[in-house]
Amino acid sequence: MAGYISDDTRKVTTHRLIEMKQRGEKISMLTSYDYTMAQIVDGAGIDVILVGDSASNVMAGNVTTLPITLDQMIYHGKSVVRGVKRAMVVVDMPFGSYQGNEMEGLASAIRIMKESHADALKLEGGEEIIDTVKRILSAGIPVMGHLGLMPQSINKYGTYTVRAKDDAEAEKLIRDAHLLEEAGCFGLVLEKIPAALASRVASELTIPVIGIGAGGDVDGQVLVIQDMLGMNNGFRPRFLRRYADLYTVMTDAISHYVSDVKNCDFPNEKEQY
């Protein structure tokens, strides 16, 4: 199946993302956590690579995103940046690195930027973290917001169900979205909210709105790379489209290798020195 490969090799920046929204060009975004995957994703033409705290789940096997540390996020960020030439690299600030006072948040943000060489950071929350967002922005660090389902708040809500289905929560989300834009955020992720609400937010904001489980009437889409490649065999949420079945492909390849080793078929004469 033929895919889309951009012939534009210029580095993606916050300014270019806003230009893409203005001309109606959708923004593509995927997660990556290591050098090899980042090279592949960047070479395939992705616009934004998110070094997500979802590494806690898909790389470390944790049930939630909460355990991943600042040092671990910096490690993953460094690994991804080394493999990228064109895409913008955004790193998630992990739980506990910015929810305290704003100066602690700024110190965490500066560490990530200095040590990983990422292009921007992403934070979950609205009004409750707006002072921290402003403080980080005042240091010249680009910030992307994240509203709707916020995995770092799983213990508050107790479930990963769709958020902002009632009027009160929807209105708060809209207010928070405007607060984040007014503070200076260059973009916003909306996760697992009604499509009509996401469409309204995208139409009201001048900054790009990227959806995950938020319908198609937004400015772009983001998915976890392991999910869209079909590497997590039992994970099939409604919003996910699987573009490959790598779980089966990889299992078959490894099984074939095991068989060849057991049967002394590998290495053969041509595979020796």
UniProtKB/Swiss-Prot annotation:
Record bears the keyword Metal-binding: yes
Any GO molecular function: 3-methyl-2-oxobutanoate hydroxymethyltransferase activity
E.C. no: 2.1.2.11
Pathway in which the depicted protein is active: Cofactor biosynthesis; (R)-pantothenate biosynthesis; (R)-pantoate from 3-methyl-2-oxobutanoate: step 1/2
The reaction(s) this protein catalyses: 3-methyl-2-oxobutanoate + (6R)-5,10-methylene-5,6,7,8-tetrahydrofolate + H2O = 2-dehydropantoate + (6S)-5,6,7,8-tetrahydrofolate
Keyword Transferase: yes
Alphabetized UniProt keyword annotations: Cytoplasm, Magnesium, Metal-binding, Pantothenate biosynthesis, Transferase
Cofactor(s) required, per the database record: Mg(2+)
Note on how the cofactor is bound: Binds 1 Mg(2+) ion per subunit.
Active-site residues, record numbering mapped to chain: E191 (proton acceptor)
Gene3D superfamilies with a match to the protein in the record: Phosphoenolpyruvate-binding domains
Membership in a protein family: Belongs to the PanB family.
Protein name, entry field: 3-methyl-2-oxobutanoate hydroxymethyltransferase
Species annotation: Bacteroides fragilis (strain ATCC 25285 / DSM 2151 / CCUG 4856 / JCM 11019 / LMG 10263 / NCTC 9343 / Onslow / VPI 2553 / EN-2)
